[in-house]
C-alpha cells in the first residue's frame, strides 16, 4: 500500500513529468470512475484479481494522471492477448504473490539481514498464563496456526502479538471473530457519501470479501489527534490485524480507508 502511494505514484509520476508525459499506465487490476466531478478507484472487472485494496491511498490527483489498461479485462483475457501478440512466455508465466523485494516471501530472513533479531519469549493464553516459548514475536502473524512449534491438545491460532512484552497470545479460531473494527489515519474521499448513508462495504485484507458495514464516526469531543472511525460489520470478520489497511467501498467505488488499530 505504502509502496504504491510513495514509490510507484510518488517517484514514478515525478519521473513522468520530467519526461513530459501526461499519464502513467500500470498493470494493476483496477478501474477509475468519475462521479460528481471527482475521480475514484473502481473495482476491476476481474473480481478475483481486483487490486483496489492496495491502491486506496492514491489521491485524486494521482488518479487523474493514471491509466489502468487491464482493469476492464480478466486475467485469462490478458494472457490470451499476450499470446496473440507473440508473448508466449509471458502468457504462461506463473503468478507471484511474493513481496517484490523479499525472495520466496521469506520475510523472516529479510528481517534478520536488516539486523532485526528478536529474542525468544512466552506464548500465553488470554489470561496471561504461560503456555510455552516462541522463537521471536516478529516471526508470527495474527491468525497463524501452522509452524507454532507447540502442541496444546487442540488447534490454536495467534490472536495477539505484544512486542513490548515479547509475548504471543494463542487462542481458538472463534477468538479472532469480531463485529467492530477501529481504524486511524483515515481518509474519506467525499463526506457526502457518509451523510447520505453510512452503510458501506469494507475489506480488512487483500483477498477477503467486502462485507456490509456501517461507519460510526466519533463525536467531535472524542476525536483524537489522528483521525479515527469505527466500522460495525453485519457479519463477524476474522483475523483483524493492526497495521493492515481497512478499505471502504460504496457502489463499487473506493470512498475511503484507514489503518487498523
Q: Which residue stretches match the model-derived regions?
A:
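Nucleotide-activated chemistry modules centered on ATP-dependent adenylation/adenylyltransferase
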Residues: 1-217, 228-254, 259-261
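Cationic, low-complexity basic patches in intrinsically disordered or flexible, solvent-exposed regions
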Residues: 220-224
Amino acid at each position: 500500500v505504502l509502496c504504491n502511494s510513495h514509490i510507484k505514484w510518488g517517484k514514478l509520476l515525478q519521473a513522468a513529468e520530467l519526461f513530459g508525459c501526461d499519464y502513467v499506465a500500470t498493470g494493476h487490476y483496477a478501474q477509475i470512475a468519475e462521479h460528481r466531478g471527482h475521480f475514484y478507484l473502481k473495482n476491476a472487472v476481474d473480481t478475483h484479481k481486483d487490486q483496489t485494496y492496495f491502491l486506496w491511498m492514491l489521491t485524486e490527483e494521482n488518479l487523474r494522471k493514471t491509466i489502468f489498461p487491464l482493469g476492464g479485462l480478466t486475467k485469462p483475457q490478458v494472457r490470451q492477448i499476450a499470446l496473440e501478440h507473440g508473448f508466449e512466455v509471458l502468457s504462461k508465466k506463473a503468478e507471484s504473490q511474493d513481496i517484490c523485494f523479499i525472495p520466496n516471501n521469506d520475510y523472516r530472513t529479510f528481517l534478520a539481514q536488516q539486523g532485526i533479531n528478536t529474542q525468544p519469549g512466552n506464548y500465553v493464553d488470554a489470561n496471561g498464563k504461560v503456555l510455552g516459548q516462541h522463537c521471536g514475536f516478529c516471526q508470527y502473524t495474527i491468525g497463524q496456526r501452522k509452524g507454532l512449534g507447540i502442541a496444546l491438545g487442540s488447534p490454536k491460532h495467534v490472536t495477539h502479538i505484544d512486542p513490548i512484552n515479547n509475548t504471543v497470545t494463542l487462542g481458538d479460531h472463534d477468538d479472532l471473530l469480531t463485529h467492530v473494527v477501529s481504524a486511524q489515519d483515515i481518509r474519506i474521499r467525499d463526506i457526502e457519501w457518509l451523510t447520505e448513508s453510512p452503510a458501506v462495504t469494507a475489506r480488512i485484507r487483500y483477498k477477503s470479501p467486502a462485507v456490509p458495514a456501517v461507519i460510526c464516526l466519533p463525536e467531535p469531543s472524542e476525536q483524537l489527534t489522528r483521525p479515527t472511525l469505527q466500522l460495525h460489520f453485519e457479519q463477524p470478520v476474522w483475523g483483524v490485524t493492526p497495521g493492515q489497511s481497512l478499505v471502504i467501498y460504496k457502489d463499487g467505488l473506493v470512498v475511503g480507508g484507514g489503518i487498523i488499530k
